[in-house]
Amino acid sequence: MSWQAYVDDHLMCEIDGNHLTAAAIVGHDGSVWAQSPNFPQYKPEEITGIMKDFDEPGSLAPTGLFLGGTKYMVIQGEPGVVIRGKKGTGGICVKKTGLSLILGIYDEPMTPGQCNMIVERLGDYLIEQGC
């Protein structure tokens, strides 16, 4: 299965009539493996900041998580495994695998729990596959 198919079929899937606003799979170096058409253009330093928080949990909390110039307030996650952020009625979930970052961005009516489930389920599967 191609990386794009993982985004199209597993991240942008419908759940209870809702779907993510945008999603992507990127390498730890920030290179895009696959993304939805409306995924925001991000800066390399934004991915560097996310990777740093996985290595040093809590490093993003004082400044927030930035992606595509949008600032998300960092909320509870799993240190070193999942980062979750909130902005208004939406937010972001980032799951780290051995080789990649799985990113999901949502807005109402999708709930944070639905976004987390979609992103983390694919991330867990890719970890099991050694990716």
Curated annotation (Swiss-Prot):
List the signal peptide residues.
none
Alphabetical list of InterPro entries matching this protein: PFN, PFN_euk, PFN_sf, Profilin_CS
Ordered alphabetically, the record's keywords are: Actin-binding, Cytoplasm, Cytoskeleton
The record's similarity note reads: Belongs to the profilin family.
Primary role: Binds to actin and affects the structure of the cytoskeleton. At high concentrations, profilin prevents the polymerization of actin, whereas it enhances it at low concentrations. By binding to PIP2, it inhibits the formation of IP3 and DG.
**Official protein name in the record:** Profilin LP04
Subunit annotation: Occurs in many kinds of cells as a complex with monomeric actin in a 1:1 ratio.
Q: Where in the cell is it found?
A: Cytoplasm, Cytoskeleton
Q: Which GO terms describe its cellular component?
A: cell cortex; cytoskeleton; plastid
Q: Which Pfam families match?
A: Profilin
Does the keyword section mention Transmembrane helix? Answer: no
Q: Does the keyword Cytoplasm apply?
A: yes
> Which Gene Ontology molecular-function terms are recorded?
actin monomer binding
